[in-house]
Design a protein with these regions (language model features):
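Short, solvent-exposed amphipathic alpha-helical segments in soluble enzyme
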Residues: 3-5, 29-30, 100-101, 162-165
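Helix N-cap/beta->alpha junction signal
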Residues: 16-17, 88
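Short conserved active-site loop signatures built around small residues
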Residues: 18, 146
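Catalytic core of DAGKc-family lipid kinases
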Residues: 30-145
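Short glycine-/acidic-enriched loop or helix-start segments at secondary-structure transitions
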Residues: 23-25, 49-50, 157-158
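ATP/NTP phosphate-donor binding region
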Residues: 1-15, 22, 26-27, 31, ...
Length: 167
């Protein structure tokens, strides 16, 4: 993504899940790419793609590319890391990083729930002290989980943040 020449391509395609999409977005933002992004949802949960109702059938994907519709989306940044769907810390926020490819292949989205249940005792002891600064305003707070989201889908759950909007 970082090295592509925008003048040679009509769009960049992200093939994978939310993690892959985040990596592609990070490369695009870091290198100031203004080329459209096409999402092929091939991950386990695909929260961002599902929020956008991106098809996952071959025919649906072909139609999507033929009738390419460009939309804008905000991209967030926390501690020099970009995110397009969600940035989280605290309880259960590390689950997506500890579920193996084998577990995802065998159990699909349930792999995340199984892993979360096995780690519940450790997760209950998770506590964060947050120092948040937005523009010129700051506040401190203790919390079990902290999340900023661009859509209403997080961890395969729909409607978590009803008023979330990608732009």
């Amino acid at each position: 993504t970082r090295d592509c020449d925008e003048n040679q391509y009509d769009f960049i395609m992200s093939v994978g899940g939310d993690g892959t999409l985040n990596e592609v977005i990070s490369g695009m933002v870091d290198s100031h790419k203004k080329i459209p992004l096409c999402i092929l949802a091939a991950g386990t949960v695909n929260d961002f793609a599902n929020y956008l109702n991106i098809p996952n059938s071959v025919n649906g994907i072909v139609e999507m590319i033929k009738n390419f519709n460009v939309i804008s989306s905000d991209v967030g940044k926390i501690n020099n890391q970009y995110f397009i769907n969600v940035a989280a810390a605290g309880m259960f926020s590390d689950i997506s990083f500890v579920v193996s490819k084998e577990e995802k292949k065998k159990f699909g989205p349930l792999a995340y729930y199984f892993k979360g249940m096995t780690q519940l005792p450790q997760q209950l002891s998770t506590n964060l002290h947050l120092n948040v600064t937005v523009d010129d305003e700051s506040f401190e707070e203790d919390a079990y989980i902290f999340a900023i989201t661009n859509t209403n889908r997080v961890g395969g759950f729909d409607g978590i943040i009803p008023f979330a909007d990608i732009n």
